[in-house]
Amino acid sequence: MKAYQREFIEFALEKQVLKFGEFTLKSGRKSPYFFNAGLFNTGRDLARLGRFYAAALVDSGIEFDVLFGPAYKGIPIATTTAVALADHHDVDTPYCFNRKEAKNHGEGGNLVGSKLEGRVMLVDDVITAGTAIRESMELIQANKADLAGVLVAIDRQEKGKGELSAIQEVERDFGCAVISIVSLTDLITYLEQQGNNTEHLEAVKAYRAQYGI
């Protein structure tokens, strides 16, 4: 686990974006942890979040031409990631996002920002069912662009309805890499290294044994 990944986990815990306990997911599964990126909700939080996304992007080595943030949660993520790339990595990246409803006046259309062209890096908070990715792919293909990859905050590394995770299904269906700032494996490593969260560690390990990929 790299320094920025450890710092991200500590940041998420500090902001209660990441919590350990018992939580019922939409799928009905009882999870020993919960991640709610919506709680990164101040200017300082957003600035820090962008730095972690930018670090993961640079670390991945994936080449791309434009950042795309799917409405709604992806919009501030794409924006802050673009700012962090410029401020901390001297990379001036175009970014754009979509409207949920197309507009017929003014600039019109359903895209805001730069053109959606070339190799597109899609940024979002998490992938649960992959629905947002599939909707975004329609836009990307309609603009004759290519999906270079997808970056999310956390990879839960758990099976969906079948044997694959939602992220693995996206990788299979669209032939692109999906990267994350941290993964379930990183959370377990963090808990092991802390050494003072035995109860949470055992619960997360048991969850991985049951649902992990």
From Swiss-Prot:
It is an enzyme of class 2 (transferase). Transmembrane segments: none annotated. One of its GO terms (cellular component) is cytoplasm. It catalyses: orotidine 5'-phosphate + diphosphate = orotate + 5-phospho-alpha-D-ribose 1-diphosphate. InterPro entries: OPRT, Or_phspho_trans_dom, PRibTrfase_dom, PRTase-like. Orotate binds at residues 34-35, 128, 156. GO terms for molecular function: magnesium ion binding; orotate phosphoribosyltransferase activity. Homodimer. Belongs to the purine/pyrimidine phosphoribosyltransferase family. PyrE subfamily. PANTHER family: OROTATE PHOSPHORIBOSYLTRANSFERASE 1-RELATED (PTHR46683:SF1). This is Orotate phosphoribosyltransferase. The lineage of its organism: Bacteria, Pseudomonadati, Pseudomonadota, Gammaproteobacteria, Vibrionales. The gene is pyrE.
